[in-house]
Amino acid sequence: MMLFKNRHVISMKDFSREEIDYILDIAEKLEPVARGEERSRLLDGKIISLLFFEPSTRTRLSFEVATRRLGGQVLSLGSVEASSVMKGENLADTIRVISKYADLIVLRHPLDGSARMATEFAAVPVINGGDGSVHHPTQTFLDLYTIRRESHLEGLKIAMAGDLKYGRTVHSLCYALSLYGAEMTFVSPPELRMPREIVRELRKKNIRVKESECLEEIIGDIEVLYMTRVQRERFPDPQEYEKVKNKLKITGDLLKSADPELKILHPLPRVNEISPDVDDTPHARYFEQAFYGVPIRMALLALTIGVIE
């Protein structure tokens, strides 16, 4: 029996394939509620605290929608500037206090490892909404859900492109897809390559890994293209960002060489790495992908609070 009640959601490495599949199954059952076609009171009387120390649109709003669709209430930090953090309060004390107010904490923080550290001081479950450039497990769960709904997971041929050095979404996704025997191609400028330790770990698991600097070389050989933006905020040197920001771009012309069934995903926000003329093609699934964050986060909230087993 899989136990999720009071469990923290910090890294994909904390979950087995069987547990991931179960979470995806629960999300699928909750999708009619996420779409407003059915009503639910699973989180009636529960308070979910959203502690976001970095900007967020989709993650934050989808957690709010997920909570409200399940009948719960949201306790949200308006801004870091308006909080006691600006007075010097440390994260540990903030977590201790918010644990007294809420039944679960969703934390986004710029420091690597901050979510794991928060669990040491929390009296309630903590869900990692993204910490530094390392982990973003709820994004990975929704990416897996999207791939399963739009294509398939087992033996998937996928390319991840863009900022593979700083992109926490691709780091988490690599591990998760390795559980399904995916074939992975990494496309990026040399400066933004996938970290070598991740590539080594994948190859130790006998996962087929290729690397390229050119989308044209690989576009006809893949089933899913996972595109990411170059993350300007992670660059210590702005000039280095300027050198690489426009190196990779998906256009309608490029897609003429793609498999007709190719699906394009993007964790959003995008900058200019996907041309607007791609949006109305059958390949573009990134807006539906953003919606899938709602049923996935509903499932994670319900399971960790313990209203679903």
Swiss-Prot record:
UniProt catalytic activity: carbamoyl phosphate + L-aspartate = N-carbamoyl-L-aspartate + phosphate + H(+)
Binding residues for carbamoyl phosphate: R58, T59, R108, H136, Q139, L268, P269
Enzyme class per UniProt: transferase
Sorted UniProt keywords: Pyrimidine biosynthesis, Transferase
Matching InterPro entries: Asp/Orn_carbamoyltranf_P-bd, Asp/Orn_carbamoylTrfase, Asp/Orn_carbamoylTrfase_sf, Asp_carbamoyltransf, Asp_carbamoyltransf_Asp/Orn-bd
One of the protein's GO biological processes: amino acid metabolic process
Gene Ontology MF, one: amino acid binding
Pfam families from the UniProt entry: OTCace, OTCace_N
Pathway where this protein functions: Pyrimidine metabolism; UMP biosynthesis via de novo pathway; (S)-dihydroorotate from bicarbonate: step 2/3
GO CC terms in record: cytosol
EC number in record: 2.1.3.2
Residues engaged in binding L-aspartate: K87, R168, R229
Subunit structure: Heterooligomer of catalytic and regulatory chains.
Family of this protein: Belongs to the aspartate/ornithine carbamoyltransferase superfamily. ATCase family.
NCBIfam families noted in UniProt: asp_carb_tr, PRK00856.1
Record function comment: Catalyzes the condensation of carbamoyl phosphate and aspartate to form carbamoyl aspartate and inorganic phosphate, the committed step in the de novo pyrimidine nucleotide biosynthesis pathway.
Name of protein: Aspartate carbamoyltransferase catalytic subunit
Encoding gene per record: pyrB
